Amino acid sequence: MNLHEYQAKQLFARYGLPAPTGYACTTPREAEEAASKIGSGPWVVKCQVHAGGRGKAGGVKVVSNKEDIRAFAENWLGKKLVTYQTDAQGQPVHQILVEAATDIDKELYLGAVVDRGTRRVVFMASTEGGVEIEKVAEETPELIHKAAIDPLVGPQPYQGRELAFKLGLSGKQVAQFTKIFMGLATLFLERDLALVEINPLVITKQGDLICLDGKLGADGNALFRQPELREMRDPSQEDSREAHAAQWELNYVALDGNIGCMVNGAGLAMGTMDIVKLHGGSPANFLDVGGGATKERVTEAFKIILSDDKVKAVFVNIFGGIVRCDLIADGIIGAVAEVGVSVPVVVRLEGNNAELGAKKLADSGLNIIAATSLTGAAQQVVAAAGDK
């Protein structure tokens, strides 16, 4: 789960990380009032969306008078910002962050992720701030310096100092960087984060370090113990179908194809998508109904899949282990009857009560194509979608 920049900076403040004075505003009037609270200009106004590339898309602007702040807010609030990280529709802008402008001398990068290879939180720092760290890693990997956090002892100040020296910092900047490093590491661990980025971490003309931007990603599996982060969730920044799926504990990811997929188990779901592609089709989604599938959840899964206008056929692939195939069949029959499915539905059932499930589908009188093998099912659904 991603957080907005203004939310990240609110958390930064609690952990002692320096950031420009700023206010998140939902109306043009609030934006003007925020500028008055901050003091004399210039100011920076930023659209708050869960996407990078805002500056190039016109979503970040330096302004010198309050009239320009109002104009910026009026132009963007309620609109959608399209960047290279969004889809063609863009992300809705509901808040504008108004901040004091910062005199920048140099831009750095500081971030952290969970490294599955080392099974540790790994911090990354670079002198190449203000640009995509992925690009730096690809073109000049030697400019990225790392520090792995030992889970037994936690972050250590010496690690921050080592990174500071590698970045060419000296004097008070080393102490400032070490404080930022320790605060950020504590924030990462205490809040169960999966990603944190300060890009850029700037050195001002006065020689001080400031967190000019902030990006936080929370581990969705740990949100049950992070109630404050759960409250920060902004569903408007998420795909509406994915948000709906989450309410029913369905794992759904929208894709660009035309064959809807409903599968139980993440591994089987990925394998199903692979075999659809292998036979010339294009999956419209990843959808895992999980091991505790019920008739109601299957019905909702159908509704979510069919809410995508691109879907020309639906492939239901169920291996009955924990979940019984006859219950899935009941859900499919109920969903097809309730939703009024007008596209072909190919169903492959294997495992627990598969024969009973297949009989229920056959006796339903509905236009459901039964498949006995995975390969055959893939070929049938691709043909039904008109891809071959």
Swiss-Prot record:
GO terms for cellular component: cytosol; succinate-CoA ligase complex. ATP binds at K46, G53, R54, G55, E99, T102, E107. It comes from the Bacteria. Keywords: ATP-binding, Ligase, Magnesium, Metal-binding, Nucleotide-binding, Tricarboxylic acid cycle. The keyword Cytoplasm does not apply. Coiled coil: none annotated. PROSITE patterns: ATP_GRASP, SUCCINYL_COA_LIG_3. Pathway: Carbohydrate metabolism; tricarboxylic acid cycle; succinate from succinyl-CoA (ligase route): step 1/1. InterPro entries: ATP-grasp (IPR011761), ATP-grasp_succ-CoA_synth-type (IPR013650), ATP_grasp_subdomain_1 (IPR013815), Succ-CoA_synthase_bsu_CS (IPR017866), SUCC_ACL_C (IPR005811), Succ_CoA_ligase-like_bsu (IPR005809), Succinyl-CoA_synth-like (IPR016102). Binds 1 Mg(2+) ion per subunit. Mg(2+) binds at N199, D213. Its EC number is 6.2.1.5. Its cofactor is Mg(2+). GO terms for molecular function: ATP binding; magnesium ion binding; succinate-CoA ligase (ADP-forming) activity; succinate-CoA ligase (GDP-forming) activity. It catalyses: succinate + ATP + CoA = succinyl-CoA + ADP + phosphate; GTP + succinate + CoA = succinyl-CoA + GDP + phosphate. Residues 9-244 form the ATP-grasp domain. One of its GO terms (biological process) is tricarboxylic acid cycle. Substrate binds at N264, G321, I322, V323. Pfam families: ATP-grasp_2, Ligase_CoA. Succinyl-CoA synthetase functions in the citric acid cycle (TCA), coupling the hydrolysis of succinyl-CoA to the synthesis of either ATP or GTP and thus represents the only step of substrate-level phosphorylation in the TCA. The beta subunit provides nucleotide specificity of the enzyme and binds the substrate succinate, while the binding sites for coenzyme A and phosphate are found in the alpha subunit. Belongs to the succinate/malate CoA ligase beta subunit family. NCBIfam families: PRK00696.1, sucCoAbeta. Heterotetramer of two alpha and two beta subunits. This is Succinate--CoA ligase [ADP-forming] subunit beta. It comes from Pectobacterium atrosepticum (strain SCRI 1043 / ATCC BAA-672) (Erwinia carotovora subsp. atroseptica). The gene is sucC.
